[in-house]
């Protein structure tokens, strides 16, 4: 029902309504959409669980109506926010309502801000339909690129992207997407009224984005991604000016059309100016990869050149976004003895020495050669830490039961644990050492057994004796069964050495949940 109301509003006059989103703030169905668990997935980040505040649907509906009434009276809303700032740590009776109002305003406004972005993803009926390749959306598609390119490079800049900046700059970045001035004023008012909250640590560059408030995560992810999109637009533009050959991008820009319109205009205006500044940055073997708050800038150039890039990036953020990026957030490392954590893998460039026997007439001699190979392995210790955070084991890796699942049926419990194991095997199929996953599967197997034993008020030994030791055999699925999308399970030939073969799937569009625990740690 709420979706139909929103669609009807946007269909009245598409061009007019897209530029005038402010009335949606006063519509009750917007806040219903914001807290509908079925629509809680933003187009900018993976689904996140909304932290409950202890209210039921009936009482929350009344509070939403009261919030809308207060927003019509601006002074009343300001007093409510100020009252929350003063009493949130004192336990005041109004603290709950103020907390609820702040969460609802944040989530509701996030839904509204997403509308201009989501409309760009929906093709018009008049436009020519361009065939889409879903394979290019796969996370695994980046690893063959790294495997092909990084093994020939010398240095890498491991960048922890600084984040931001002054609140007003965040609003200014959104101006190119949202033409509705009242909505921008409302966002500016909301941010400045709550700038002293603990959940607004984004204005302190030394703080990690992991401290963002869970209540406001959806809104601040939009703000953060708009900032990253703006910085990458400027960075890619300057990079293209430093070399005459047109660079290509392997990632999908949400604003692809808008991006190229702006870059074509800027090239005509600023071409001569930037060529004089960036002449010493020419490097035909420069590659940039980013995921969330981390980026990799790899080069085949010398140490002096990569050091110049580091200095340039520090000044880049300072002069374009008006904040100081500390140099220690950018590390220079040679590929020969460096490994980095990226997308749930520990990646490195291995040097494999080999000797070749040569014969010339009657003389024999050996020629030593060195070859570089891009290698990816499963980070076992970090995965155990993720299992510990998810309450499957202790910090030392000792399996424990999952009490919250003990109320489910036996088939549901085994299905959940089995799905986790299959997803892990599927996602980490690109590892060159798959035997390390056996320890993870062992932890999940015993955790499942202890959860079943907890439900039946028994021990693991008695449970396995009663139900059979083959009950949990699916947790040790062989590799030839894991890669069943390519080779059917009825294959007549064994896949020898499959535990060493790396397979990159093209149907993975999001990082595994267990690997995702470590992205902002």
From Swiss-Prot:
**Transmembrane parts of this sequence:** none
Primary subcellular site in the record, as a coarse category:
plastid
Q: Give the matching PANTHER family.
A: MATURASE K (PTHR34811:SF1)
What is its subcellular localisation?
Answer: Plastid, Chloroplast
Which gene is transcribed and translated to give this protein?
matK
Molecular function as annotated in GO: RNA binding
State the function annotated in the UniProt record.
Usually encoded in the trnK tRNA gene intron. Probably assists in splicing its own and other chloroplast group II introns.
Q: List the disulfide bonds.
A: none
The protein's name in its UniProt record: Maturase K
Q: What's any one GO cellular component for it?
A: chloroplast
Q: Which family does it belong to?
A: Belongs to the intron maturase 2 family. MatK subfamily.
Which keywords accompany this UniProt record? Answer: Chloroplast, mRNA processing, Plastid, RNA-binding, tRNA processing
One GO biological process from the UniProt record?
Answer: RNA splicing
Query: Which Pfam families does the UniProt record give?
Result: Intron_maturas2, MatK_N
């Amino acid at each position: 029902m709420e979706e139909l109301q929103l669609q009807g509003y946007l269909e009245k006059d598409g061009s007019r309504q897209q530029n005038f989103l402010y009335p949606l703030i006063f519509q009750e169905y917007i806040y219903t959409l914001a807290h509908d668990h079925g629509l809680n997935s933003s187009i900018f980040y993976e689904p996140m669980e909304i932290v409950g505040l202890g209210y039921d649907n009936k009482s929350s509906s009344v509070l939403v109506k009261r919030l809308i009434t207060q927003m019509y009276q601006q002074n009343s809303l300001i007093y409510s926010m100020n009252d929350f700032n003063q009493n949130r740590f004192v336990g005041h009776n109004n603290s709950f309502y103020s907390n609820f109002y702040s969460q609802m305003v944040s989530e509701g406004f996030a839904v509204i801000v997403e509308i201009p972005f989501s409309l760009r993803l929906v093709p018009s009926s008049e436009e020519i339909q361009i065939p889409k390749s879903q394979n290019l959306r796969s996370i695994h598609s980046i690893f063959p690129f790294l495997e092909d390119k990084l093994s020939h490079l010398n240095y890498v800049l491991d960048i922890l992207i600084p984040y931001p900046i002054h609140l007003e700059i965040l609003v200014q970045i959104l101006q190119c997407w949202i033409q509705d001035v009242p909505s921008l004023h409302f966002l500016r008012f909301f941010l400045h009224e709550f700038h002293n909250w603990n959940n607004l640590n984004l204005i302190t560059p030394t703080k990690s984005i992991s401290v963002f408030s869970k209540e406001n995560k959806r809104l601040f992810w939009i703000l953060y991604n708009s900032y990253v999109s703006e910085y990458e637009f400027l960075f890619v533009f300057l990079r293209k000016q430093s070399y005459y050959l047109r660079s290509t991008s392997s990632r999908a820009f949400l604003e692809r059309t808008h991006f190229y319109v702006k870059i074509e205009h800027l090239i005509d205006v600023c071409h001569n100016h930037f060529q004089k500044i960036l002449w010493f940055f020419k490097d035909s073997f420069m590659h940039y990869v980013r995921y969330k708050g981390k980026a990799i800038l790899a080069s085949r150039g010398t140490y002096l050149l990569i050091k110049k890039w580091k200095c340039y990036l520090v000044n880049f953020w300072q002069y374009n976004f008006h904040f100081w990026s500390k140099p220690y957030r950018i590390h220079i490392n040679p590929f020969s003895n460096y490994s980095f954590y990226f997308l749930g893998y520990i990646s490195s460039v291995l040097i494999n020495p080999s000797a070749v026997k040569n014969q010339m007439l009657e003389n024999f001699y050996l020629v030593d050669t060195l070859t570089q190979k891009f290698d990816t392995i499963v980070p076992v210790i970090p995965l155990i830490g993720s299992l510990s955070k998810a309450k499957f084991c202790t910090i030392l890796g000792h399996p424990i039961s999952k009490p919250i699942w003990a109320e489910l049926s036996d088939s549901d419990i085994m299905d959940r644990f089995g799905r986790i194991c299959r997803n892990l095997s599927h996602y980490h199929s690109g590892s060159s050492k798959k035997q390390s996953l056996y320890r993870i599967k062992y932890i999940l197997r015993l955790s499942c057994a202890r959860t079943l034993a907890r439900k039946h008020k028994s021990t693991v030994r008695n449970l396995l004796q009663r139900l059979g030791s083959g009950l949990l055999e699916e947790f040790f699925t062989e590799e030839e069964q894991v890669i069943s999308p390519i080779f059917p399970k009825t294959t007549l030939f064994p896949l020898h050495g499959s535990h060493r073969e790396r397979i990159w799937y093209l149907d993975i569009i999001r990082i595994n949940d267990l690997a995702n625990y470590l992205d902002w740690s």
